[in-house]
């Protein structure tokens, strides 16, 4: 299942309706959770309670019926996630009720929507202008309507399509992620860490300080909150753009990609490096590699990181040695050494901006 995300531009009247639908879905979500906490665990019995709930609360009819029904499934999905975390030894609390302002999305799961003449037509809302910056390929199974904390609205189309494997390249590569360099690969390319958070933190702190000085409930406080949300949103967008382009490059050009199996949740507990590891978003990068590889017919092989950075031969870079050892383990040939695999032409440091601007870390196309 793929997700296509597009910006929505509702009118003031449409935004008012969208906010009313969000509130209706939040109300139903909390009511379903209340019923579950009261001992009702049958999903279909809970769905049967919705018509009576709408009779008691006529304003709920402002929302599309399937959107309200989806909140029953959302509660059960969240409960399953908590149960899975608990089985894996994680400490988890109870599912929480959603407060006003903390409910961000609702779903048209099967019907009630269509695209027509540059507009997304939603049942109970009407036609909303949408910026379709790319073609949707595949069968649309549902639409998520989401409001970001910055106040921007988006439509996320859930699309089912057939994966199309890329042509085999015969190329293999090992990747070692790090703090100084975002990654070093076994061909001798070192991608600089973009450090988006470090570059944004001062702006975020200034906006947090301004927000803290505004009177609660005032219009000025809301304006300050939106400015802060936009700063965080820009940070996330910059980071995701970099990670998507870099992961896409490796998927397009290498048939096998070997990486370390990292315990990132444990690593971030390091008080000196935790923030830098989170800023680098290694976990997100590795997840992008994995799901893109699955669709493209590529292989991402995770290896045990133990010992990959030890016993560095004279004249070799430590991160390059680690990348070569990761590759040899990924190929199932641990006896291969960096010396036998051959030194790189010359380690080349590539600015993160090169990846963002060209979509490739290399000054040439790998084919």
Language model regions located:
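Gly/serine-rich nucleotide phosphate-binding loop at the start of the catalytic core
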Residues: 1-69
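Positively charged, helix-rich recognition surfaces that bind polyanionic ligands
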Residues: 3-5, 16, 124, 134-139, ...
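A generic secondary-structure signal for well-formed alpha-helical elements
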Residues: 25, 29-36, 79, 83-86, ...
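Stable alpha-helical structural segments in soluble proteins, enriched in small hydrophobic residues
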Residues: 32, 71-82, 318-330
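Surface-exposed helix-capping loop/turn segments at secondary-structure junctions
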Residues: 37-40, 81-91, 293-300
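Short alpha-helical "patches" and their helix-cap loops
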Residues: 39-47, 88-98, 339-346
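Acidic carboxylate diad motif detector
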Residues: 48-148
């Amino acid at each position: 299942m793929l997700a296509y995300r597009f910006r929505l531009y509702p009118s003031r009247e449409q935004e008012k309706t969208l906010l009313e639908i969000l509130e209706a879905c939040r109300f139903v979500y909390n009511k379903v959770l209340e019923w579950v906490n009261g001992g009702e665990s049958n999903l279909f019995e809970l769905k049967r309670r919705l018509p009576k709930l709408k009779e008691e609360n006529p304003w709920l009819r402002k929302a599309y019926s399937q959107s309200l029904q989806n909140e029953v499934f959302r509660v059960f999905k969240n409960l399953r996630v908590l149960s899975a975390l608990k089985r894996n030894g994680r400490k988890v609390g109870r599912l929480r009720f959603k407060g006003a302002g903390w409910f961000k999305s609702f779903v048209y799961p099967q019907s009630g929507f269509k695209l027509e003449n540059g507009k997304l037509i939603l049942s109970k809302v009407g036609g909303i202008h949408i910026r379709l910056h790319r073609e949707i390929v595949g069968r649309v199974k549902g639409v998520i309507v989401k409001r970001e904390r910055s106040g921007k609205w988006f439509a996320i189309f859930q699309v089912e399509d057939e994966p199309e494997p890329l042509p085999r390249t015969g190329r293999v590569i090992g990747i070692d992620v790090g703090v100084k360099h975002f990654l070093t690969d076994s061909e001798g390319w070192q991608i600089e860490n973009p450090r988006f958070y470090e570059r944004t933190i001062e702006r975020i702190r200034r906006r947090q300080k301004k927000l803290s000085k505004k009177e609660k409930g005032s219009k000025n406080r809301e304006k300050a909150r939106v400015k802060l949300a936009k700063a965080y949103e820009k940070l996330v967008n910059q980071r995701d753009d970099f990670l998507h382009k870099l992961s896409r490059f490796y998927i397009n050009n290498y048939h096998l990609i070997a990486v370390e199996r990292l315990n990132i949740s444990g690593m971030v507990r390091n008080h000196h490096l935790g923030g830098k590891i989170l800023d680098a978003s290694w976990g997100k990068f590795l997840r992008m590699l994995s799901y893109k590889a699955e669709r493209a017919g590529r292989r991402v092989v995770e290896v045990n990181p133990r010992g990959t950075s030890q016993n560095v031969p004279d004249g070799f870079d430590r991160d390059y040695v680690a990348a070569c050892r990761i590759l040899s383990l990924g190929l199932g040939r641990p006896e291969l050494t960096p010396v036998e695999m051959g030194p790189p032409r010359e380690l080349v440091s590539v600015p993160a901006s090169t990846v963002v601007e060209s979509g490739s870390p290399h000054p040439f196309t790998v084919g």
